[in-house]
């Protein structure tokens, strides 16, 4: 019951005072299934893109982290091109004090500052390390094409 109350508060807070760069809502009034959008950060190759993701919240939240997957295609070393899975430190260092908004904030930060040393897409990570201009060009093209 405590998890239910906490999730209710988190979604209520997000709906009442959403950050300017993201939004979230429940899917079919199910507290354990959310949809979220994150705007690409200014100055990044993802700028002007709006990226959607699914959030699945486990029954033992907040003791276990939520699972987030991009549903918008994105060219990024830490996001799996085929299924939108995300590799971010927040999932491996999860603590019950963290909230869904903290996870969304972390995901937005990896759009600005990818971690090519812990990739899900090794070729994209290699390009990010060795040819940043080509990486930025492709990431901008994908953003324009998919993140409308």
Curated annotation (Swiss-Prot):
Q: Matching Pfam families, A to Z? A: UQ_con
* Catalysed transformations (reactions): S-ubiquitinyl-[E1 ubiquitin-activating enzyme]-L-cysteine + [E2 ubiquitin-conjugating enzyme]-L-cysteine = [E1 ubiquitin-activating enzyme]-L-cysteine + S-ubiquitinyl-[E2 ubiquitin-conjugating enzyme]-L-cysteine
Pathway terms, separated by semicolons: Protein modification; protein ubiquitination
* Location of the UBC core domain: 2-148
Q: Does the keyword Transferase apply?
A: yes
Q: Which domain of life is it from?
A: Eukaryota
Task: State what the entry records as the consequence of deleting this gene.
Answer: The developmental pattern of protein ubiquitination is altered in null cells. Null cells are blocked in the ability to properly execute the developmental transition that occurs between the induction of postaggregative gene expression during mound formation and the induction of cell-type differentiation and subsequent morphogenesis. Null cells plated on agar form mounds with normal kinetics; however, they remain at this stage for 10 hours before forming multiple tips and fingers that then arrest.
The record places the active site at: 87 (glycyl thioester intermediate)
**Recorded E.C. number(s)?**
2.3.2.23
Keywords assigned by UniProt, alphabetized: Transferase, Ubl conjugation pathway
Give me the Gene Ontology terms describing cellular component: nucleus
| Protein family according to the UniProt entry | Belongs to the ubiquitin-conjugating enzyme family.
Q: Subunit info?
A: Interacts with mkkA (via F-box/WD40 repeat domains).
Q: What does this protein do?
A: Involved in protein ubiquitination and degradation during development. Mediates protein ubiquitination at the mound and finger stage required for subsequent development and may be an essential component of the developmental transition between the induction of postaggregative gene expression and subsequent cell-type differentiation and morphogenesis. ubcB and ubpB differentially control ubiquitination/deubiquitination and degradation of mkkA protein in a cell-type-specific and temporally regulated manner.
Protein name, as recorded: Ubiquitin conjugating enzyme E2 B
Species of origin:
Dictyostelium discoideum (Social amoeba)
- The encoding gene is ubcB
């Amino acid at each position: 019951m405590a998890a239910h109350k906490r999730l209710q508060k988190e979604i209520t807070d997000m709906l009442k005072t959403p950050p300017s760069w993201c939004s979230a809502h429940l899917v079919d009034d199910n507290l354990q299934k959310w949809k979220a959008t994150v705007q690409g950060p200014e100055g990044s190759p993802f700028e002007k893109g709006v990226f959607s993701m699914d959030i699945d919240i486990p029954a033992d939240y907040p003791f276990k982290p939520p699972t987030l997957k991009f549903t918008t295609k994105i060219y990024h070393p830490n996001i799996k091109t085929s299924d939108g899975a995300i590799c971010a430190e927040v999932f491996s260092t999860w603590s019950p004090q963290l909230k869904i908004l903290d996870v969304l904030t972390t995901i937005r930060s990896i759009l600005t500052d990818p971690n090519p040393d812990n990739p899900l897409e090794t070729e994209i990570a290699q390009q990010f390390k060795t040819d940043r201009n080509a990486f930025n060009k492709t990431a901008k093209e994908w953003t324009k094409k998919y993140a409308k």
